[in-house]
């Protein structure tokens, strides 16, 4: 009995070695044969345009890519069948994969919602910054015009003071005009002080908004990186993993394709 088992094990080992040798030779020689069947002579391509050559290289790359994918799929399929004992995927494995996939999808959706909220907040803050900037620029223009008026009033006042120093009699209407100019000058100075204080407050508010915007940009970048990490965790396939994990990844991809077909 033990001898039969050992003989059977020896036969299975030889078969496995032969199949592995065939697979290795197929992997080594397959691309060469494919390249030999699809390669075009270099002398014939010289007379063609660069665009036509580029199209040929693209088609060749597509064929080679498909061939490599087909070879890898065949190899994984054969290794899964010829394992001793053969690898079987149970319903529990599928349920675990579905649970993991659903949890990852939920996390991805929540991250997407957070990113959308951050984007809306950034847009709102940008609009507020734009409106505040426009109002500050308008106030600056008004301040410039007020300063020009102030300079003209100061020049007129200086002229009146020079005229008064010549001991010429001041007419009542001129004296009234001087008082009016002085009161207007005081009002203008008060308005300038008010505008300066408002400009300082607006500058502080603008600096605070700029800081908030930089923080929001950092949070948006972090959320985008987390979203990309989750996507990569869902779609990443490790070529050097064991056969069982590769089959599980294959089932996961099939489930995603079915979900996409159902959503359409």
Curated annotation (Swiss-Prot):
Q: Which gene encodes it?
A: sos7
Would you tell me the Gene Ontology cellular component terms?
A: kinetochore; Knl1/Spc105 complex; nucleus
Q: Which family, according to UniProt?
A: Belongs to the KRE28 family.
Give the coiled coil ranges. 90-236
Q: What's its job?
A: Acts as a component of the outer kinetochore KNL1 complex that facilitates microtubule-kinetochore interactions and the spindle assembly checkpoint. Kinetochores, consisting of a centromere-associated inner segment and a microtubule-contacting outer segment, play a crucial role in chromosome segregation by mediating the physical connection between centromeric DNA and spindle microtubules.
Subunit field text: Component of the KNL1/SPC105 complex composed of at least spc7 and sos7. Part of the outer kinetochore KMN network that includes the KNL1, MIS12 and NDC80 complexes. Interacts (via C-terminus) with spc7 (via C-terminus); the interaction is direct.
User: Where found, per UniProt?
Assistant: Nucleus; Chromosome, Centromere, Kinetochore
Is Cell division a UniProt keyword of this protein? Answer: yes
Specify the protein name: Outer kinetochore KNL1 complex subunit sos7
UniProt entry tagged with the keyword Cell cycle = yes
Q: Which GO terms describe its biological process?
A: attachment of mitotic spindle microtubules to kinetochore; cell division; homologous chromosome orientation in meiotic metaphase I; mitotic sister chromatid segregation; protein localization to kinetochore; regulation of meiosis I spindle assembly checkpoint; spindle attachment to meiosis I kinetochore
Q: Which UniProt keywords apply?
A: Cell cycle, Cell division, Centromere, Chromosome, Coiled coil, Kinetochore, Mitosis, Nucleus
Q: Which Pfam families match?
A: Sos7 (PF20882)
Its principal location? nucleus
């Amino acid at each position: 009995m033990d001898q039969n088992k050992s003989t059977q094990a020896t036969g299975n080992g030889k078969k496995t070695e032969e199949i592995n040798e065939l697979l290795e030779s197929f992997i080594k020689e397959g691309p060469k044969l494919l390249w030999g069947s699809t390669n075009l002579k270099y002398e014939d391509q010289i007379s063609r345009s660069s665009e036509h050559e580029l199209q040929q290289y693209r088609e060749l790359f597509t064929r080679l890519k498909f061939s490599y994918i087909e070879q890898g799929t065949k190899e994984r399929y054969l290794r899964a069948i010829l394992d001793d004992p053969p690898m079987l995927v149970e319903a529990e494995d599928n349920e675990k994969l579905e649970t993991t996939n659903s949890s990852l999808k939920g996390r991805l959706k929540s991250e997407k919602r957070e990113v959308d909220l951050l984007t809306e907040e950034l847009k709102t803050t940008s609009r507020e910054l734009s409106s505040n900037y426009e109002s500050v620029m308008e106030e600056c223009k008004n301040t410039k015009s007020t300063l020009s008026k102030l300079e003209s009033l100061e020049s007129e006042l200086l002229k009146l003071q020079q005229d008064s120093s010549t001991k010429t009699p001041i007419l009542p209407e001129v004296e009234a005009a001087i008082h009016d100019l002085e009161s207007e000058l005081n009002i203008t100075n008060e308005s300038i002080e008010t505008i300066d204080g408002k400009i300082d407050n607006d500058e502080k508010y603008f600096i605070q908004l700029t800081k908030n915007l930089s923080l929001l940009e950092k949070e948006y970048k972090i959320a985008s990186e987390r979203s990309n990490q989750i996507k990569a965790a869902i779609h990443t396939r490790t070529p050097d993993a064991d056969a069982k994990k590769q089959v599980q990844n294959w089932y996961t991809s099939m489930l995603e394709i079915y979900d996409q077909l159902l959503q359409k």
